[in-house]
Structure formats: C-alpha cells, structure tokens
C-alpha cells in the first residue's frame, strides 16, 4: 500500500470550481486527513493558486489531524487534545477559536506543515511499537510475552503493547510511507523502511 492524495486533490478541485467565494469572508477549510508534511505546499496550495485564489486571503487553509479512539468512551472529540496549524497565524487563531468550541484542549503547531505530519508520526510510532511486540512474541515462544509486556508497561515511560494478529486499521501501515514521503533525508529513517 502507498499513501494517496488523490481524494484530497479531487475535493480541492471541486472547491476551487466554486466561483462565488467571498473575499470579505473567505471560507475556512480544515483538513483532518492523514498527510505528509509537504502535501499542502506541493499539491494543494498550487492547485488553489492555479485557480486564481490566494491562500490566506481568498481561502483560509489549515490542518487539524483527526484523533479518535473508538474503544474508550472517555476519549472523545471533546476530551482528546487537538493539534492545529494554519498556513498563517490568522488562520491558526481562527482554527483555535472554532475547534475550541468543541475540544477542551487545542494545541498550536508552528504551521500547517508541523500539524500535517503529527498524525503520520503518531501512527508510525504505534506501528513500530506493535510490530516490536509481535516480533518479541515470535522470538520468545516459550515466554508469555503478553505478561512480560504488561509488566514492562508499568514503567512510567514505556507504553503497553501486546502481540496481536495485526497492527491496526488501514491507516497504521500507511503511516511510515507518509512520514518518508515528506522527509528530506529518508535514509535517516531506516526504522520505517
């Protein structure tokens, strides 16, 4: 599997075809998709500008990676911290105000690039940790690795992961590709290859 921006690109093509955009009250678009750090700069912003619109003036654009956890009722859109980053400070400020109506904690990223890569890195961490748990289980077949990892997880700075038949939904295996896609020095990320 490889990451694709095809659907995101198609949505923005449709948005840009809408010609009645008010320059007095420019629309705000918050992208929640899993992204590489450079997809807005390399693909989406040029597409918007090719259609005669100026990002930050005619259209406000930012990123707020989705965070949800369906297995725990205490982890909701309201309680999970949201990361936001706009293409300029004004957009970020607006995103904080809008998402602050719903979310208890809104965290400002330096900009849209920093916000964009958050979800990919979160998911890549998760994949590495679960893969390691699975490998430990195979490497030590005579040890109850679930039990050992539960004990390991009692240390304050180590997460608790358990061996399983997989590593998560469709997005988890894609995460390393998103991280690598935007990296200038891909060879430095040998764990993700």
Give residue ranges: language-model regions:
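Structural/interface elements that position substrates and couple domains in central-metabolism enzymes
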Residues: 1-193
